[in-house]
Every structure is written in C-alpha cells, then in structure tokens.
C-alpha cells in the first residue's frame, strides 16, 4: 500500500515516540517501514524541518545513526521547574529502580529488568524526565543499549554529596538470586532515604 509523505512522517513520529529515549536506528526504521535508506533520509529531513518550523516543544535528533525525539533546549527552564518535586513523591518502584541504578551504574534497561523481574521502561522514562537519571553512554554489542546513571539532581534530592555516601552492600550481594538482590537494593536505599528525611 503506497503512503504519501505526510503519512510517512506521522508513522515515523509514532514509532519514535513509542521507542522513547532509546530511539530507533536507521536499520530498524528501514526494516519496519520497508523502504530504502535513501527514501528514509528524505522522510527524516522532512520530519526534522517540520519540527524546526512548527511551534513545538520537541525536536528530532540524530546520534550515531539513531533517531530520537527530544525536548528543545529553549524549554529546559520549564523542565527544571517540573523536576523540582519532593523525593517523597516517588513510588516504591521508582525508588527501587533508583537504588539499582545508583549501586550498579552504568546499567542498561535490560539489566535493570533482569534484577527486578518486571518491565521498567516507563519508570526509567519518568526518572529521566525528572532528571534523576540520565544517559551516560552506550553499551557495546548489538543494539548499543543506553547506559543509565544518576545525576547531580539525584544527589541533591536525596541529600547526598557523592554516591560513596550510600550504605555499602553486604559482600554476598552478588551471589543472591535476582529478586533477593532487588529487595536488598531497595532496603538499603530506602534506609538512606529515611535517614535524610
């Protein structure tokens, strides 16, 4: 079924939105859309131009052959206001993910999900939007998964000067089964959180 350029742009936008902060590679887009790379390049130029011309808060970015949607820099002051929320407003699941990242960083989403035993994409997006976590690099290997780490905002929100102020993990933490490991992270992190309240 042939689609015109407007429909292609809408489909690309939907795909990039669904992909979140991991974005999609050129290869992934070409495969999903079943088009040639040259055609994709033209579509992406149209999408990027539309975001630049329109009065929108997001833009199309390209990094290492990966496309993603991101917030325009001029709106950063408003995002900073948004993330200035009390840490007590975080859910138990969010605290658990923060605990895992703070002890294991840099860490991929897949590794976090292995430890927790449940999907964590939505929580990660929320924590990134609050500037408590950020992308600190890309993992080696297929897919070049995003590596997550904590931010200065994380330290500030939890009353820490450095990550070294987190309570040490027991020596046998690495030998525990994954669920026990997640429980241990959360217990230690929650204790730190209680100490600084």
Swiss-Prot record:
Classification via InterPro entries: ScpB_csome_segregation, WH-like_DNA-bd_sf, WH_DNA-bd_sf
Disulfide feature: none
Gene Ontology terms: biological process: cell division; chromosome separation; DNA replication
Keyword match rRNA-binding: no
GO cellular component, one term: cytoplasm
The keyword tRNA processing is annotated on this UniProt entry: no
Location of this chain's protein in the cell: Cytoplasm
Alphabetized UniProt keyword annotations: Cell cycle, Cell division, Chromosome partition, Cytoplasm
Function: Participates in chromosomal partition during cell division. May act via the formation of a condensin-like complex containing Smc and ScpA that pull DNA away from mid-cell into both cell halves.
Family stated for the protein in its record: Belongs to the ScpB family.
Subunit relationships: Homodimer. Homodimerization may be required to stabilize the binding of ScpA to the Smc head domains. Component of a cohesin-like complex composed of ScpA, ScpB and the Smc homodimer, in which ScpA and ScpB bind to the head domain of Smc. The presence of the three proteins is required for the association of the complex with DNA.
NCBIfam families named among the record's database cross-references: SMC-Scp complex subunit ScpB
Protein name per the record: Segregation and condensation protein B
Native organism: Bacillus velezensis (strain DSM 23117 / BGSC 10A6 / LMG 26770 / FZB42)
């Amino acid at each position: 079924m042939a689609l015109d350029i407007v429909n292609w742009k809408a489909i690309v936008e939907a795909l990039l939105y669904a992909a979140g902060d991991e974005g999609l590679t050129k290869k992934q887009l070409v495969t999903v859309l079943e088009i040639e790379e040259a055609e994709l390049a033209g579509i992406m130029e149209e999408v990027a131009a539309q975001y630049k011309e329109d009065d929108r808060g997001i833009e199309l970015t390209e990094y290492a052959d990966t496309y993603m949607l991101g917030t325009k820099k001029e709106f950063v002051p408003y995002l900073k206001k948004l993330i200035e929320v009390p840490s007590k407003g975080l859910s138990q699941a969010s605290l658990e993910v923060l605990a895992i990242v703070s002890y294991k960083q840099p860490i991929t989403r897949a590794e976090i999900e292995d430890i927790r035993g449940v999907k964590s994409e939505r929580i990660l997006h929320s924590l990134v939007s609050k500037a408590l976590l950020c992308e600190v690099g890309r993992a080696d290997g297929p897919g070049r998964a995003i590596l997550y780490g904590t931010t200065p905002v994380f330290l500030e929100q939890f009353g820490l000067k450095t990550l070294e102020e987190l309570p040490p993990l027991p020596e046998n933490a690495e030998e525990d089964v994954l669920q026990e490991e997640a429980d241990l992270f959360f217990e230690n992190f929650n204790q730190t959180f209680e100490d600084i309240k």
